[in-house]
């Protein structure tokens, strides 16, 4: 190829072109391409029209074969061309990306004969460096193994995995299968399904390296299929099909756009040249690419085929034979051994005629697949056994005689029983060769049993703590509220004594020594101490919440008022007082007030009778770890202390005293008013005097019919309004009537003033007109 628009990137002697970077610089000039470029390769049989397709699609000038002269190899090595023009059905005016096209030497050519080393390395190189690999094939080649390059693709896939399979990225390559001379008799979907099935089958049969055993074909490749009409017999349709194909290379944002981000190598253009050269060097120098002879290839193919047939027969019998036996160890192991031996025997009978090293290699691989398949059943059996044994253990623990057997003893006995039965079953599988290694299973079993026992212990502990909490919290609340609602000077001594006794009563069953407890679930001394500490924390938090929620300002005022009224309103024997003089009221007031305020300071600050502040012996919250957090500010800007003993601030204390004084002052005033009312009531003789002196007027009224009628009407009206509470509507009606009357009067006055003003203006205008006439 002598065209100046392309260079031979890799020549026939497998040498990489050392001036590739200069070629790229010539193609792009001074433009900063960055990542806005794409690489496409074409791969296929010799003389299948690869170069022709590239020239029509990308407007390149690769050399093509003249079929009228001779069918021979045209492209030698790997050629590279640059283009920005793609043949499409639509005009794209915006700036198109730079595309670099690799034309790979055709496979299965007579020039190289049986030397297939270069074509396989070239195909591997194309996959390694390209975003899109166009696989050019004829429709009649689909279904063939050698003719459609499936054998070559299998080798390339395998080596590609070994070289690039462990890369920790999501890079993929698009395999674009272009089916030539597609006449449409067989739908494209059917052809694509056939090729896809062949590729998936090839992938499952690959010898995958460590770390890639579970990989899928679609982890590394995406598949697309396009059909093209016959170039000579259907030239117009061929051109139209190529243009439609070109649309997928330029129409960004569409579903069929081929240059997806995950295909790009994310390297600048000069970095790509270095990457491509390093890839070729790795492919060329890797010893694993020294391909075996055709005889070894045949042996590998046939032994793989025999192995797959034996494995398929094994799998077809497996589920039906094993399903009824999964719960019986003896029957299950016998059937597994039988099925495995039948599969290996069938393989040995047919595959032992081929090369021994290949035969043994595939036999080992088959044995591994069988063990892998069987291991699922073994794991399922062991898991089922584990669940059954665990259910038995839980039943034994829950139904034990708690008077003679402790929780710890029951769990320990059950654990020993589980381990013994599980290990015996696992050894049975191992002796029969069904289980190669039991270390992983044993480790998993040990971790599982320890985790389950821990969960069982946690559940038992949670139940015990729940029972303690269920009794402890309500008892504390009830006792504390009762003591605070009827406080004495030693109320905090009483509360703390009750607090300690309530805790002790609820956990006395677990006490072994003074301040030492054992909750009987197999915990260490430090763990038991931690649980005891948590119970005390719960108790202190309950006490703290109860005290501070109950002793609010209104509650304390109510307590003080009740203490005041107990002394002020009732005597020593509990009888209500009857006041006679104000001096008696004032004396009782002073005594009652002093009695009430005796507990005010007690309710403001939690201190014992020895005047020692009550401080919790355990941290009630994380905030208590630092002294800076003891004081906080509320939404109203008032500072408070988080310390348990500090109940009221100074400002709150003043508020309590103010409310208390107002309430007791009202009580005293009411008492004094009762004395005044008693003294100032109207004597009965006044009513007799009024009747005697007003008798004549009363008789005059009742003798006059008009007065009697008006009196009855007004009395009945007053009774109805008062009886049904209609004073509000009556007042509204009166107010409305008065308002309407006032408005009407204002309108009349306004109208009168306006009319008077208009009359005056008319007289003035007449006088003004007369004066003008006189002047004229």
Swiss-Prot record:
InterPro entries: G_GB1_RHD3_dom, P-loop_NTPase, RHD3/Sey1, Sey1/RHD3-like_3HB. Pfam families: RHD3_GTPase, Sey1_3HB. The chain crosses the membrane at residues 682-702, 706-726. It comes from the Eukaryota. It is a multi-pass membrane protein. GO terms for biological process: endoplasmic reticulum membrane fusion. Keywords: Endoplasmic reticulum, GTP-binding, Hydrolase, Membrane, Nucleotide-binding, Transmembrane, Transmembrane helix. It is found in: Endoplasmic reticulum membrane. GTP binds at residues 44-51. GO terms for cellular component: endoplasmic reticulum membrane. GO terms for molecular function: GTP binding; GTPase activity. Residues 34-263 form the GB1/RHD3-type G domain. Residues 703-705 are lumenal. Its EC number is 3.6.5.-. It is an enzyme of class 3 (hydrolase). Residues 1-681, 727-776 are cytoplasmic. Interacts with RTN1 and YOP1; GTP binding is not required for these interactions. Cooperates with the reticulon proteins RTN1 and RTN2 and the tubule-shaping DP1 family protein YOP1 to generate and maintain the structure of the tubular endoplasmic reticulum network. Has GTPase activity, which is required for its function in ER organization. Belongs to the TRAFAC class dynamin-like GTPase superfamily. GB1/RHD3 GTPase family. RHD3 subfamily. This is Protein SEY1. It comes from Saccharomyces cerevisiae (strain YJM789) (Baker's yeast).
């Amino acid at each position: 190829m002598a065209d100046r628009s392309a260079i031979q990137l890799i020549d026939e002697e497998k040498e990489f072109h050392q001036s590739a970077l200069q070629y790229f610089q010539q193609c792009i000039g001074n433009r900063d391409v960055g990542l806005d470029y794409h690489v496409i390769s074409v791969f296929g049989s010799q003389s299948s029209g690869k170069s022709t397709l590239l020239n029509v699609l990308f407007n390149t000038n690769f050399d093509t074969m003249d079929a009228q002269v001779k069918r021979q190899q045209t492209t030698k090595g790997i050629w590279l061309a640059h283009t920005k023009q793609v043949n499409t059905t639509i005009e794209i005016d915006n700036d198109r990306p730079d595309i670099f096209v690799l034309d790979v030497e055709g496979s299965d050519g007579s020039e190289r004969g049986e030397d297939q080393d270069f074509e396989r390395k070239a195909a591997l190189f194309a996959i390694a460096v390209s975003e899109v690999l166009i696989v050019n094939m004829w429709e009649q080649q689909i279904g063939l193994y050698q003719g459609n390059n499936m054998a070559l693709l299998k080798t390339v896939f395998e080596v590609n995995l070994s070289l690039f399979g462990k890369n920790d990225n999501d890079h993929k390559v698009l395999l674009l299968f272009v089916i030539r001379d597609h006449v449409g008799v067989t739908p494209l979907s059917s052809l694509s399904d056939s090729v896809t099935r062949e590729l998936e089958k090839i992938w499952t049969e690959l010898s995958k390296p460590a770390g890639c055993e579970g990989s899928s074909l679609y982890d590394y490749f995406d598949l697309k299929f396009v059909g093209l009409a016959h170039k000579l017999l259907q030239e117009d349709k061929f051109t139209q099909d190529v243009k439609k194909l070109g649309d997928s290379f330029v129409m960004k944002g569409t579903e069929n756009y081929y240059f997806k981000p995950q295909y790009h190598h994310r390297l600048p253009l000069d970095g790509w040249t270095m990457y491509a050269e390093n890839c070729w060097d790795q492919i060329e120098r890797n010893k694993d690419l020294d391909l075996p002879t055709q005889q070894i290839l045949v042996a590998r193919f046939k032994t793989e085929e025999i192995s797959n047939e034996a494995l398929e027969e094994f799998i077809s019998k497996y589920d039906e034979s094993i399903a009824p036996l999964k719960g019986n160890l003896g029957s299950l192991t016998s059937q597994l051994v039988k099925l495995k031996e039948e599969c290996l025997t069938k393989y040995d009978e047919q595959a032992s005629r081929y090369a021994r090293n290949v035969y043994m290699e595939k036999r080992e691989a088959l044995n591994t697949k069988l063990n892998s398949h069987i291991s699922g059943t073994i794991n399922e059996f062991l898991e089922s056994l584990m669940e059954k044994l665990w259910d038995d253990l839980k039943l034994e623990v829950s139904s034990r005689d708690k008077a003679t057997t402790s929780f710890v003893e029951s769990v320990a006995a059950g654990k020993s029983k589980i381990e013994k039965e599980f290990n015996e079953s696992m050894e049975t599988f191992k002796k029969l060769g069904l289980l190669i290694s039991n270390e992983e299973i044993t480790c998993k079993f040990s971790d599982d049993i320890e985790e389950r026992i821990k969960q069982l212990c946690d559940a038992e502990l949670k139940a015990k703590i729940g029972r303690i909490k269920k009794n402890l919290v309500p008892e504390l609340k009830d006792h504390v509220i009762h003591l605070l609602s009827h406080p004495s000077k030693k109320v905090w001594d009483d509360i703390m004594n009750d607090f300690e006794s309530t805790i002790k009563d609820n956990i006395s069953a677990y006490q072994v020594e003074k301040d030492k407890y054992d909750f009987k679930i197999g915990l260490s001394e430090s763990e038991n101490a931690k649980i005891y500490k948590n119970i005390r924390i719960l108790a202190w938090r309950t006490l703290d919440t109860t005290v501070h929620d109950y002793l609010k300002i209104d509650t304390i005022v109510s307590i003080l008022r009740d203490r005041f009224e107990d002394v002020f309103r009732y005597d020593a024997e509990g009888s209500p007082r009857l006041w006679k003089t104000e001096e008696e009221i004032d004396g009782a007031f002073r005594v009652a007030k002093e009695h009430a305020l005796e507990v005010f300071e007690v309710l403001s600050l939690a201190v014992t009778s020895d005047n020692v502040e009550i401080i919790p012996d355990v941290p009630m919250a994380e905030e208590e770890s630092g002294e800076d957090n003891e004081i906080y500010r509320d939404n109203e800007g008032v500072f408070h202390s988080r310390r348990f003993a500090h109940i009221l601030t100074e400002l709150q204390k003043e508020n309590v005293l103010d409310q208390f004084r107002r309430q007791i002052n009202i009580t005293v005033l009411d008492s004094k008013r009762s004395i005044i009312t008693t003294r100032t009531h109207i004597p009965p003789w006044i009513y007799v005097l009024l009747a005697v002196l007003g008798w004549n007027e009363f008789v005059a009224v009742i003798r006059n019919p008009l007065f009697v009628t008006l009196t009855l009407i007004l009395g009945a009206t007053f009774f109805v309004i008062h009886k049904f509470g209609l004073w509000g509507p009556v007042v509204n009606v009166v107010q409305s009537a008065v308002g309407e009357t006032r408005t009407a009067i204002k309108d009349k006055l306004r109208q009168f003033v306006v009319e008077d003003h208009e009359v005056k203006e008319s007289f003035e205008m007449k006088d003004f007109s007369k004066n003008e006439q006189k002047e004229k």
